[in-house]
């Protein structure tokens, strides 16, 4: 071990069954690096310490080799087999210290730098909010000054109050204009045949979005082979040749100029995207069946500008492009909108950003072999047409309804068919009546020896209920629209509202702290739990302190607050038991 790093000879395994790739492991405080002995091997690994979620290791003395299994935050495992246990323990201890340091440094920076980097304007805004809102000031004093919450935690949930200007600012992205790229008109000087195109960043973005081949050509040619001005000159020369519909001239110039041919030939990148989309279409949708509905082949129908009726030599067919293709592509790009949010005057940056976005979307859209198979199976199931299937005769249970009223009124028509001793039922009714009559006569003669409730207690309860009901009717009759909260004394009402606001604040921070992944969150949840317990006790004391005729209604007001706190307490206890049991099952840290 030298300075702030450690190096050991290990074997790297991507899975447990992997035989392993020999090499050396170098660990620093911020990074873990594995370099294989074979330079041609692709098992080189680089992991940031802050991305390591957990580490597991084999217990010394077991029959297993010394393995150290590191799991990152993406749930991917990296297994290292060491030559001996001391080397493994040395690396494990080094990683543990590095993880602890990575965990403490962000927390320290949040506490120290956030207050230092606060501008005077932000501090003035906070003080202004506290002065204008007495309830906010009371919450701040209750939780921040008592150190239940830090200053940053308290204001983190009130970003809307601190950033009203950002709220007023529209977050909607600007779309693309509906004007087509082919509609860009040049300006002329009136004396020569020279034309000038005025290219804005928006026009360039639209060209790159509609024509991937032009975007890729810009990345390949500018500035290595030509300047940006020469590039756009060739592009608009190609557009001019398209507009003349003279495919012979276009083919001749493309044969002489290799760079110009890129703009004149069909867009292969766009063609690949189209083929990929077609493969994902349900094969039961037969587009050829709709060709009979096409009227463009009839006289006086169709788009004459489309060029579909022009006679073109077969060898020049690749230099032909229809208006319909341009319209469809332009419509697709306009509907897609701006896929990137880059505001730069550098055309190359825009082109590269668009290319990266397309590559990411392509990677996301690629389906695996299993997913492809599932899609084909789903299509085969959908392809089955109901009118061509054999009739499905499901087994039916015949209904036996003697009287329709038995079915519609009691739905017990079949029950009547089962003999269940109707005569015995009638005889039992007479016996039960006789027994009840004898019991009543006996009670009249001797009385109840052991009453269920003492008469004094029952009289007191009924009297109290009578007074409460009479009072409630009297109060409710005065102002039906008035709520019970308005009838409470002002001090009690303010206390109830403050408790409700405090509980909302505590629960907001409590639930946002889960899952507990750091010591900082564990400490924060403990403070919040103690504060909620204190609030719970205050609620109980408040219920006992109110007048007896208001106690029931106050209990109804307080009950939702206590239920919310009980749910938080239950979650805290369950999570604590789970973490305690989990740590108890792994005394050596190995799962």
UniProtKB/Swiss-Prot annotation:
Pfam families to which the protein is assigned, alphabetical: BSD, PH_TFIIH
GO CC field: transcription factor TFIIH core complex
Compartments reported by the entry: Nucleus
SMART domains reported for this sequence: BSD (SM00751)
Top-level lineage group: Eukaryota
Gene3D superfamilies for the chain: 6.10.140.1200, BSD domain
PROSITE patterns for the chain: BSD
InterPro entries reported in the protein's UniProt record: BSD_dom, BSD_dom_sf, Tfb1/GTF2H1, TFIIH_BTF_p62_N
SUPFAM superfamilies cross-referenced by the UniProt entry: BSD domain-like (SSF140383), PH domain-like (SSF50729)
Alphabetical keyword list: DNA damage, DNA repair, Nucleus, Repeat, Transcription, Transcription regulation
UniProt-listed GO biological process terms: DNA-templated transcription; nucleotide-excision repair
Residue intervals of the BSD domain: 112-166, 191-243
Subunit and partners: Component of the 7-subunit TFIIH core complex composed of XPB, XPD, TFB1/GTF2H1, GTF2H2/P44, TFB4/GTF2H3, TFB2/GTF2H4 and TFB5/GTF2H5, which is active in NER. The core complex associates with the 3-subunit CDK-activating kinase (CAK) module composed of CYCH1/cyclin H1, CDKD and MAT1/At4g30820 to form the 10-subunit holoenzyme (holo-TFIIH) active in transcription.
Family: Belongs to the TFB1 family.
Role, per record: Component of the general transcription and DNA repair factor IIH (TFIIH) core complex, which is involved in general and transcription-coupled nucleotide excision repair (NER) of damaged DNA and, when complexed to CAK, in RNA transcription by RNA polymerase II. In NER, TFIIH acts by opening DNA around the lesion to allow the excision of the damaged oligonucleotide and its replacement by a new DNA fragment. In transcription, TFIIH has an essential role in transcription initiation.
Identification of the protein by name: General transcription and DNA repair factor IIH subunit TFB1-1
């Amino acid at each position: 071990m030298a300075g702030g790093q450690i190096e050991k000879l290990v074997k790297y395994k991507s899975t447990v069954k992997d035989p392993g790739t020999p090499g050396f492991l170098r660990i620093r405080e911020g990074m873990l690096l594995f370099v294989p002995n074979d330079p041609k091997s692709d098992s080189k690994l680089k992991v940031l310490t802050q991305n390591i979620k957990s580490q597991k290791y084999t217990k010394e003395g077991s029959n297993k080799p010394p393995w150290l299994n590191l799991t990152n935050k993406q749930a991917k495992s990296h297994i290292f087999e060491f030559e001996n246990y001391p080397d493994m323990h040395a690396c494990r201890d080094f990683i543990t210290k590095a993880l602890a340091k990575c965990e403490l440094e962000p927390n320290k920076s949040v506490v120290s730098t956030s207050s230092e980097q606060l501008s005077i304007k932000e501090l003035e805004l906070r003080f202004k909010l506290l002065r204008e809102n007495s309830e906010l000031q009371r919450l701040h004093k209750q939780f921040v000054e008592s150190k239940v919450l830090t200053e940053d935690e308290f204001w983190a949930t009130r970003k809307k109050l601190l950033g009203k200007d950002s709220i007023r600012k529209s977050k909607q992205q600007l779309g693309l204009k509906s004007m087509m790229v082919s509609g860009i008109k040049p300006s002329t000087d009136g004396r020569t045949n020279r034309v000038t195109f005025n290219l804005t960043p928006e026009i360039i973005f639209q060209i790159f979005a509609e024509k991937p081949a032009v975007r890729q050509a810009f990345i390949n040619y500018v500035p290595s082979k030509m300047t940006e001005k020469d590039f756009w000159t060739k592009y608009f020369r190609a557009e001019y040749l398209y507009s003349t519909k003279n495919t012979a001239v276009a083919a001749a110039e493309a044969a002489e100029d290799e760079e110009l041919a890129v703009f004149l030939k069909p867009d292969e990148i766009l063609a690949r995207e189209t083929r990929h989309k077609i493969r994902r279409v349900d094969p039961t949708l037969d587009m050829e069946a709709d060709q009979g509905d096409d009227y463009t082949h009839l006289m006086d129908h169709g788009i004459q500008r489309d060029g579909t009726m022009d006679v073109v030599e077969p060898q020049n067919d690749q230099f032909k492009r229809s208006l319909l293709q341009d319209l469809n592509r332009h419509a697709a790009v306009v509907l897609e909108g701006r896929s990137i949010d880059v505001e730069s005057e550098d055309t190359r940056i825009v082109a590269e950003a668009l290319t990266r976005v397309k590559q990411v979307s392509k990677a996301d859209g690629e389906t695996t072999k299993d997913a492809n198979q599932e899609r084909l199976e789903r299509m085969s199931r959908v392809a089955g047409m109901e009118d061509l299937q054999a009739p499905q005769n499901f087994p039916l249970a015949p209904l036996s309804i003697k009287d329709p009223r038995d079915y519609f009124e009691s739905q017990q028509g079949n029950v009547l068919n089962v003999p269940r001793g109707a005569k015995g039922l009638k005889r039992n009714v007479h016996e039960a009546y006789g027994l009840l009559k004898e019991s009543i006569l006996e009670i009249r003669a001797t009385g109840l020896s052991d009453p269920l409730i003492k008469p004094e207690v029952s009289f007191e309860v009924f009297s109290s209920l009578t007074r409460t009901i009479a009072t409630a009717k009297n109060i409710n009759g005065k102002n039906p629209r008035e709520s019970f909260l308005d009838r409470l004394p002002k001090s009690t009402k303010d206390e109830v509202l403050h408790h409700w606001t405090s509980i909302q604040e505590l629960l907001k921070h409590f639930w946002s702290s889960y899952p507990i992944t750091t010591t900082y969150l564990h400490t924060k949840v403990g403070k919040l739990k103690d504060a909620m317990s204190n609030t719970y006790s205050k609620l109980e004391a408040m219920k006992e302190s109110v007048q007896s005729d208001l106690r029931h209604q106050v209990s109804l007001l307080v009950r939702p607050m206590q239920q919310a706190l009980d749910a938080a307490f239950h979650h805290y206890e369950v999570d604590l038991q789970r973490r305690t049991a989990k740590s108890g099952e792994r005394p050596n840290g190995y799962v």
